């Protein structure tokens, strides 16, 4: 599963939004995305998705929310 797909999955479960650090930790702990180099998903990757998928994610009140 791609990082953005994992983020949608997690945010759909949690209706109140999540911080980038929480999203990265949840993706890694549940092994929803495995990087090719074996490193854990970083907060930077989560922010990349938020910034590059504005129709899907929004940032408000210190949390990332689903737009869909």
PLM segments and residue spans:
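Charged low-complexity interaction tracts in eukaryotic proteins
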Residues: 1-4, 18-21, 27-68
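Short helix-capping/hinge SLiMs at alpha-helix to coil transitions
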Residues: 12-16
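Hydrophobic residues on short alpha-helical segments
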Residues: 4-11
